[in-house]
Structure formats: structure tokens, C-alpha cells
Amino acid sequence: MGDLSSLTPGGSMGLQVNRGSQSSLEGAPATAPEPHSLGILHASYSVSHRVRPWWDITSCRQQWTRQILKDVSLYVESGQIMCILGSSGSGKTTLLDAMSGRLGRAGTFLGEVYVNGRALRREQFQDCFSYVLQSDTLLSSLTVRETLHYTALLAIRRGNPGSFQKKVEAVMAELSLSHVADRLIGNYSLGGISTGERRRVSIAAQLLQDPKVMLFDEPTTGLDCMTANQIVVLLVELARRNRIVVLTIHQPRSELFQLFDKIAILSFGELIFCGTPAEMLDFFNDCGYPCPEHSNPFDFYMDLTSVDTQSKEREIETSKRVQMIESAYKKSAICHKTLKNIERMKHLKTLPMVPFKTKDSPGVFSKLGVLLRRVTRNLVRNKLAVITRLLQNLIMGLFLLFFVLRVRSNVLKGAIQDRVGLLYQFVGATPYTGMLNAVNLFPVLRAVSDQESQDGLYQKWQMMLAYALHVLPFSVVATMIFSSVCYWTLGLHPEVARFGYFSAALLAPHLIGEFLTLVLLGIVQNPNIVNSVVALLSIAGVLVGSGFLRNIQEMPIPFKIISYFTFQKYCSEILVVNEFYGLNFTCGSSNVSVTTNPMCAFTQGIQFIEKTCPGATSRFTMNFLILYSFIPALVILGIVVFKIRDHLISR
């Protein structure tokens, strides 16, 4: 290949890495730390897809199988860093998922993953591997120190507060984060730390449990060249501290070539090569493809092992070349050495223990308390979200206020009609404002819980419950602000007790709307779809259950039965009784009667109550109990849904 001096760690870019003494399982010195090994033996993964669209019933049994991984075997030891190269769709991320036990249920996995010669069981993967994904899923309104502090509280049982804080400070120092410890994480709209620093925070969160095997899915994605190089050098340093580091990478610079202990190349799920940088140069030289001088070996070998699909001729030509190289590797001494190392570790008389992460997590309620504090601190710092949450109902109420101004007692001037219209809006709009809050705020927390639950920090339902508990005081305050302004200004029933009942009756649908949205967000990934579904359910509930548009007693039996399962029925009856009971109406001048104007049929509020919802007066307390029973029912349903989500995603 020519002079490789420009590719060494001390080359032109000045990438200095302490190579240290790589721990080797073959004759390791007595003073070396405990060595560990990771082996993947004959890993294959395939998924099946329907031949035609889902609506084509005739083809429901016709499927085609796509092979994503094909007989991949790798071996790496502690103190080493392995880089996995490959074009898009080559199977790099799937291979990491296979290593970490995160493959989906939709496919079929064949092969074994060995750590220290022991085949891992499904429940052991989570406790053995730390996995840093491409995207940094962090809460933007927390500082770096707070982010790591809360992660540590979730991962490690708190003992001595001093030693606990020292752990966080030590990890920040190890990853050069101390100078930004008190800065917010931030996001695209909120200033914060840089993208490279966010990536280091994600790595630091994993280091808190002292993992011995760390996996990184394209850790340099979205970073500039210098920052990407710094991240790779950091990972090399982590590997030198008796860890196994495996990462996928996209278009690395040539200066990094000699930093990796092993380099693997995938093409369409097949392992084209896996060995040291020196072995790679010799192997491709022997295949007749020497890397040109002054070329980036990563780019050269990536192009060499990729299939060009721009034309049929080029596809055939490049496919033959890739197959030739893959066949040569399978027959090479490098491949045989990999298989031999795995088999040797499997048959040791005394197998080393599997290096699990620090596993001393706190109890369920302790984790729930930590999550509640973290969620509250993160959301309270979002000033716009807090203002929106508190004033959203009020803004809707101001529109009603300007439109109606003040209700009257004269039936001919809309005394009943205005009140019914207001109650209809109260019942229909309050669940929707709750839904808007959840759709706006919870998806970020859901993404965090999806990742952290796979890391074994907690279960997804705990994040959902923490959010639900966080919602309660904000919802109470928001409802009281709305009620205080609208109730008295609109001139509704002038009794303080009635005001209290009114506020309590509106708090329930607001919470129900938000909790119903949480349940659906546990089922449906797209928040826009959840928005539409909740809106449709709210509209349907008001139409069927409120009795404002059509008397429930006059509805067809199926709709009448459905109305009993809508919270709008009970909320509407409470509001109607609360407002109309004890009211007396006038009907124009004294000489106007029912015979001259049918609208004068209702001169007392009780008459309207008995006409629209008979017996609601005697059911007032029961309606409150039933209305508020929807809240714990939705919370329990949400826990079940998120437990199922946890099972589906984590397994």
C-alpha cells in the first residue's frame, strides 16, 4: 500500500491514543485485569414480508423472505475496539441488535452470542451490554449534571450521597464534560451544549453502570469531521480500560484506520472481512486489490465490497467481485482463527463469569419518585409549555366569553339556549385541551422511556405513571383559572358551592382527555394519528352521551347503551343539574304564555332537567363517582398498554 505513516495515530491530525497493553486471553500477564471476550457464531437473521399489500386477502399466505444477516462470525477481546463498515442496508445495525439481544420478533434469528465462552440467555443481554443508539434521546431542559444524576439514581441504589455524587463527577471527568456540567442539554430550538457534547452525555449515561461490553450504532452521525474523530478517539480510550467496544461507522477518515484493533466489512448481510488493519491490507493485496497510496483505505475497501446497482452490467460485475472476496475470506486463515478462538473459549475447563453491568437498582417506588422529579423539572423549565398548559382552557373560555358575554334569565332572549350551548362547549372542549397537552409533551418522554427501558433502568409504564402524576397539579390549577374567570363573568348560577361543583366537573374530562391520549400513545407511534383519534372519540362521545343534540331517551337502543360508556353523559348531567337546579326563568312580558309561545314551556330549571335528563338530580353524587372512576380506569389501562409495549419493544 505504500507509506502508512499518514495513517498512524501520530499522523498529521495528531490523534494521540494510549495503546496500553491490550488484554489478550492467550497468555495474559498475571497482573492484567480480568480479560473478557465477545463471540458471535454463525449469526443469521431473516424477516418475512407479504408479497402484496395487506388489503389483498388472496395473497395473505404468500410471503417472501429477506435475509438480512448471513452466517456472520466475529470475535473481539477486552481492550479492543472493533469497527463495522458497510453501505446502507448492509446489516450493520441489525448485527448490533443481534449482539445486544434487541432483534424484533418479526424475524428469525439463528446463531449464538457468547460472552466469555458462555452462550447468553435472552434475559441476560440487557444486563451485559450497553448500547448507544444513533440519536441522542435526552431531555432538553435538564443540565448535563442533572441528566447523569437522575440516570444514576435510576440505575444504582443510593448509598453514601458523597460517593454517589463522586461517581457522576468521575464519569463527567472521564468524558471531558465537567466544563459543561451546569449547561442545559438543549435542542434545535433551545440553546444548549454542542452535538458532540450531547453524544458524550449519551455515552456517559451508559458508563454509570460500568459496562464491560459497549455497542455504538454510528456514533459519528451528524458530527463534523473533527468532532467525529474526537468521539472515536474517546471510544478507543474507553476500550483500553479493559472494555470491549464495537461500533458501526459511516465514512471514517483515514487517520482512524490504525486506531481500530479490528475492522469488519458487511455487504448485503454477509461478512466480507474481519481482522486487524494489517491483516486487512495483506488480505486485499492477496486478492489482487492493493489500496492505492494516499487513498483512504476505508473508502477504497467500502467501494470495493459494495454492489453497484446503477446498471445491470455493473451489478453483475460488482456482485461477482464481492462474492469472490467473501469466498476468499471464508477460506482464509483469518476467518479460521476467529472460529477457533470462539470454539476455544467455549471449551475452556473454567469459564470466566459473564461481566454484567453494575446491578443494584432501587425499588419500584424509588424509581417512580425519581422519574416524577425528573419529568417535573424538565417540563417546568419549558416556560412556553407551562404557560400553554395553564392558559389553554382559559383562551378557549375567553372566546366563549366574548361570544356570549353574559347569560340572561329571559327564555325568549336565549336564557336556556345560551346555557346549553356553553355546557356543550365545556364538555366537548376540555378533553381536547388535555389531549393537546399530552400530544405536545409526552412523545419525547415516551422516546426516552423506550430507550432507557431497553437499558434496564425501569419499565415504560413507570414513565407513563410519573407523567400522569405530574399532570394532576397543573390540571387543577389550569381548571381553577378557567373556572374563576368564566363562571362568574358569564353569570352562571351565583353560588360558591355550585362554582366548586362546576370546577370539579370540568377537571375530570380534562384529565380523561389527557390520560386517554397517553393510552393511545402507548399503542400508536404517530402523535398526529392519536390527535385525530381522540378528537373523533370526543366528538362521538358528545354526540351520543351529552344529550344536548338529541335526548338520550329518544335514541335507538344501541346508542342509548353506548352512552352509558361515555364520560360525557355523566359530566353533562352534572353540569345541567348544577346550573339549572333552582333557577327560575322569565318569558318576555306577563301576558306571554305557553299557548302564545312554546318556548315558555320552561319557566323553571327543574322542568328542563326532567325533560333532557330525567332523574339526574337524584344521581348527582353517583354521576360524580362514575365520572371520576374513568380516571383510575384509564391509568390502569395505560399501565397495561405500556407493559405490553415494554414486552414488544424490549423482546
Swiss-Prot record:
Activity regulation: the record says: The ATPase activity of the heterodimer is stimulated by cholate. Taurocholate, glycocholate, taurochenodeoxycholate, glycochenodeoxycholate and taurodeoxycholate also stimulate ATPase activity, but to a lower degree. Glycodeoxycholate has no significant effect on ATPase activity. ATPase activity is inhibited by vanadate and by berillium fluoride.
What are its cofactors?
Mg(2+)
Glycosylation sites per record:
N584, N591
Subunit structure, per the record?
Heterodimer with ABCG8.
Residues forming the ABC transporter domain are 52-293
Positions of the ABC transmembrane type-2 domain? 388-645
Corresponding gene? ABCG5
Q: Which residues lie on this side of the membrane: Cytoplasmic?
A: 1-383, 443-467, 522-528, 645-651
EC number from the UniProt entry: 7.6.2.-
> What disease does the Swiss-Prot or TrEMBL record associate with this chain?
Sitosterolemia 2: A form of sitosterolemia, an autosomal recessive metabolic disorder characterized by unregulated intestinal absorption of cholesterol, phytosterols and shellfish sterols, and decreased biliary excretion of dietary sterols into bile. Patients have hypercholesterolemia, very high levels of plant sterols in the plasma, and frequently develop tendon and tuberous xanthomas, accelerated atherosclerosis and premature coronary artery disease.
**Protein's UniProt name:** ATP-binding cassette sub-family G member 5
- State the membrane topology: Multi-pass membrane protein
Q: Which GO terms describe its cellular component?
A: apical plasma membrane; ATP-binding cassette (ABC) transporter complex; plasma membrane; receptor complex
Instruction: Please provide the record's keywords in A-Z order.
Output: ATP-binding, Cell membrane, Disease variant, Glycoprotein, Lipid transport, Magnesium, Membrane, Metal-binding, Nucleotide-binding, Translocase, Transmembrane, Transmembrane helix, Transport
Q: What is the effect of changing E146Q?
A: In STSL2; decreased maturation of glycan chains
Q: Where along the chain is ATP bound?
A: G86, S87, S88, G89, S90, G91, K92, T93
Tissue specificity field? Strongly expressed in the liver, lower levels in the small intestine and colon.
- Segments spanning the bilayer are 384-404, 422-442, 468-489, 501-521, 529-549, 624-644
Which segments sit on the Extracellular face?
405-421, 490-500, 550-623
What does the UniProt PTM comment say about this protein?
A: N-glycosylated.
- Location in the cell: Cell membrane; Apical cell membrane
